[in-house]
Amino acid sequence: MNTNESALLIEIENYILEIYNRKSKPKDFYDDLSRLLIEFNGIYNSDYSYFGCIEAFVELLRELNICLGCQGELAQQLKNLSFKYIQCRFEFYVSRHKRKLRDHRYSENENTAQLVKRMRTVSQRYSRILVVRLDLAYKKKYHHSVDIADFDNDMRILRQRIHNQDGIFKGLIEYAWALEQGTEKGYHCHLLLVYKGHEHKNAYGIAERVSEIWKKITFNQGCYFNCHSPEYLNQFEEQGTLGIGMIHRNDPDQVGNMLKAIQYLVRPEKEEQYLRVKVCKRMRTFG
């Protein structure tokens, strides 16, 4: 695959939202539309589930008898459809998009509440817990070769390792993960791991070992961010808001900061980070 699937889907979504809000036809409307349609056709998979606005392009591919081999020819054929007609088509899918975003926000709120409940229970059960946070993604130079199927497969392997408590995951008492898609990071995962504090003490070291597993799973295409690097932690320590690392049950401030920090995994405000495509409708994005 030579197309950056993640970036293209975000570009298409932004394009549809822009056209929906336009008062008049943009100068290069048909050229831009034909280019995006051809590029989308190159990555389109009928088995996948596309989010909101992207469905407008799926329907254009299905319904219009158009030539997708040449951008110039396609642009000419698209001119048979008025700007207002296409804009009205987009309007229908933008409305569906907004409804799905509301559903997404509700689901994320539910996930947040469940995670906070789980972590509050864990913090009450043990005198101290080690909360480990890291983000897993792909190096930018490989974004063009990683699609949603690759991301889903890599995450399935990682989750199986976690579930089996294999290696560094031995002794886990809680964990959570959230799959997202961003303009800069592409497909990525926020990962939370929780251990008994009397058995593990080095959160930075654990995150580093997990990152090595991620690199192996992705054949060295993966990258990571260790949330326990001193530079990153210092800003929270200075503000008195540090909520990862060693958390003591008898320190209400630490527990409170921890419960706030873990909400970042599924924070509803990060709406632009949702997946625009899933390998199937039931593909999980949080657990």
Question: Where do the model's predicted regions map?
Answer:
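Histidine-centered divalent-metal-coordination microenvironment in nucleic-acid enzymes
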Residues: 174-198
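"Short basic amphipathic alpha-helical interaction patches in structured regions
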Residues: 148-149, 192, 205-208
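Catalytic "initiation/cleavage/transfer" segments centered on a nucleophilic residue
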Residues: 35-41, 48-74, 94-125, 197-287
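Structured loops at beta-to-helix junctions and adjacent beta-edge loops in soluble globular domains
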Residues: 135-137, 180, 268
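A short, flexible beta-alpha/helix-coil linker loop
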Residues: 139-143, 194-199
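Extended repeat-based interaction scaffolds and adjacent low-complexity, acidic/S/T/P-biased segments
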Residues: 1-85
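Signature for HUH/AEP ssDNA processing cores
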Residues: 116-176
